[in-house]
Amino acid sequence: MPRHIRQLFSACLATLTVSVLMSGCAWLPPQACLPPSRIMVSAEMIFGRNIGDRPGISESAFANFVAREITPRFPDGLTVIDGDGQWRDGVRNVDVRERAKVVLITFADDAQKRADLVAIADSYKRQFSQQSVLTKVGNACVSF
């Protein structure tokens, strides 16, 4: 099986696993938050920085991506954190490690904002030849 097919399969399997695990998450009832907190959507997006097996997405390229794709969709704010990620390539039976960027976004629940998360991930995959962007979405009690 060609390597790119194996990698795609591994990424799809990881995405499916996260989706199944997240499907059991319960929504918080409004009374679950203590004042002055309120329920908002909390999203974490994890962007790998390798292209293939090699480092390839620079700090400036990622900063430009945030400025063009994320900030216009979420102008109220976001947080970017550096990370080190790893995942198991079951086909090659090796651990793959890479630098990552974690983007945290909190927003009032809105169908368009949820669609924006998908658009951001799709844009990153297209622009940087990525197989996937891990996106985790849930409710959180938030106060500012």
Give, region by region, the residue ranges found by the protein language model.
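Mature extracytoplasmic domains of secretory-pathway proteins
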Residues: 61-100, 105-111
